[in-house]
Amino acid sequence: MSRRSFLKSSSVAAAIPVMGTTGSVLAKENSPANTGITLDYPETAVGNVNQLPINKPVNFNYPDSGSPCAMIRMGQAVPGGMGPNKDIVAYSLLCNHMGCSLNYEPASRTFKCPCHFSIFDSEKAGQMVTGQATEDLPRILLSYSEDTGDIKAVGVSGLIFGRQANIL
């Protein structure tokens, strides 16, 4: 191999990793998280405060039919709670570790994953307590009408499992 051929080959080999990094930097700079773009979530009626039992989940899908969620009236004010007593919260029912369906345990007021045993605290904004998950549960943002008692899902805080963006 001549010196000239060696230098050409070396230059190309050295440039390949740099080109890959440049592409990922450009993609990151143009992602919605870095451009200040907010996603337009649908407003979806999910219940009425007068019909919500205390500490019993009411299931619904949000922001689309592929995303199961649960709304719970805790019976006491909690962080991020909505409604007249600031005690109504909603979360995605997909564990953010591997996407398994979560079960609500009324006695401990936690969501438990039957697949890998992650536990999330519903009274502490879906905080991950233990297990394989590394993030808190995505919170479903709610709005409440004082006039009618109607509750609507209006957004998501956190990324729903298996998605690059919550709105498909």
What are these regions (language model features)?
Residues 17-18, 112:
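A short hydrophobic/aromatic micro-motif that marks alpha-helical segments and, especially, helix-coil
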Residues 93-96, 110-116, 120-154:
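Cys/His-clustered metal-coordination modules, chiefly Zn-binding fingers
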